[in-house]
Amino acid sequence: MLAHLSINNFAIVKSLQLELSKGMTTITGETGAGKSIAIDALGLCLGGRAEASMVRQGEDKTEVSAAFHLDNNLLASRWLEDNELLEGKECILRRIITKDGRSKAFINGSPVPLSQLKTLGQLLINVHGQHAHQQLMKPEYQLSMLDQYAGHADLLKATRHAYQNWRQASNQLKQLRENSQQNQAQLQLLEYQIKELNELALGEDEFVELEQEQKRLANSGDLALNCQRAIELLNEGEEVNALGLLQSVSHTLIDLAEMDSKLTALPSMVAEALIQLEETYHELRNYLDSIDVDPERMAYVEERYSKVMSLARKHHVLPEELYQHHQALLQQIAQLDCSDEKMSALASEVDVLYQTFVAAADKLHKSRVRYAKELDKLISQSMHELSMEKAQFKIEVQQDSAHSSPLGFDAVTFLVSTNPGQPLQPIAKVASGGELSRMSLAIQVITAQKVDTPSLIFDEVDVGISGPTAAVVGKLLRKLGESTQVLCVTHLPQVAGCGHHQLFVAKQTKAGKTETQMLKLDQEQRIAELARLLGGSQITESTLANAKELLIAA
């Protein structure tokens, strides 16, 4: 429930602090005093649109905050907990608007996006505006009212989810089909491009090995000649060779070491060098023996190497990248080849998803039909109480499978007959302004009782109503206030007198500036205000007596 409202520098309000209570609170005031200004300010806390013109003239910013008790609001508490914003049993929404139109939103002191403020606001307060009777003529509003009364949140969520899944898959299938012809042309091009690569069948690391072999074969003569020269220098030279010389050095060092111990380490060092030279000699000898210049092999390697280089140039890649390029083209072809198979599988999936949507929409439809009959009776009864004794009301729910939406297949129409003998027709065709106001109020009061929102606001919803009908409206709202908090802006004394509490809005001018104030009235002040509403500026004993009767009758 709304416990406190703080308004600073909003429109013509300098500063306003309101403590609010359970039950029904009525708000009255003179014409032009700004009876709805507190509701407008509260709307900012609930995520309403912000404008620079809302900032009081001469001030830098507007700041509005609303404190709510969460004792009986499990949905709001759960939402706050899920979003890591829960702080005890109270929730404070705050909004700041600067004179240049910038806006900041806060929940329990933490900055939040406006979307979160709106979402939480819907769990805290339900606002019924003075133009609701105009909305009542719109089919989408009529459908919303029925769903709200029936508590279709879960069914609507399931239907919307099924619809979105079906439409997403349908759009994917449509895109695949549109691309099919283009894919065929692309497939033919890829198959032409890949033909030579398939014939080449290059291995993953083959080019590196091929390049090394080609270089080796191309230089085989020089390799053999230089190998032979190195072998001769190492060990096979007739006049001199490295191993022979090093062996002579080794013998000499051994003799020297025997003569002087300081040279003991030198023979072993030369011995190690001898071992390495001998190993080098044997490696070269084996390598020379392996050199076998095969003209056929050389021709094969040259031809294959040339093909790799040619295809690499043709495909605009480096030779060492040709294998990966080939694999990428194969993958593209595989993807295009399976497009028909993919389309077939996706078409089957679309059918399944559509049937899921149809099942969810049908379940929602049946529930709407059931609750429409229930709501028919309640609204007709309420209209009779609101001085429309002969009126008949009916909600028509028609299912049209050709027109699907996230809300299912249903079209809802509110039908009414205001006089005996008249057929039921859409309310926009037959109802007058006053009748629309009464029907709208009846629907709002009935649906409000079904919504799990602890605070309800009725902003001049009694427009077009007077006399005994106004008294009935007041009693309906008071009864509603016994189970939930109701704030009602009204100009009717019969409605104002039914409130458990009453606030008075006054406008005054100070130092050339207009200010709006809101006062909580005691019993005597309420009688005086009700008398003013009954008789205008001239308050008489008769109007005072009537005002007292209104309070007693409530």
Swiss-Prot record:
Family: Belongs to the RecN family.
Cited NCBIfam families: PRK10869.1 (NF008121), recN (TIGR00634)
Positions with a binding annotation for ATP: G29, E30, T31, G32, A33, G34, K35, S36
PANTHER family according to UniProt: DNA REPAIR PROTEIN RECN
Any single GO CC term annotated in Swiss-Prot or TrEMBL for this entry: bacterial nucleoid
Pfam hit, one: AAA_23
Gene name in the database record: recN
Gene Ontology terms for molecular function: ATP binding; ATP hydrolysis activity
TM stretches of this protein: none
InterPro entries: DNA_recomb/repair_RecN, P-loop_NTPase, Rad50/SbcC_AAA
GO biological process: DNA recombination; double-strand break repair; SOS response
Function recorded in the entry: May be involved in recombinational repair of damaged DNA.
Keywords assigned: ATP-binding, DNA damage, DNA repair, Nucleotide-binding
DNA damage listed as a keyword: yes
Protein name per Swiss-Prot or TrEMBL: DNA repair protein RecN
Species this protein is from: Vibrio cholerae serotype O1 (strain ATCC 39315 / El Tor Inaba N16961)
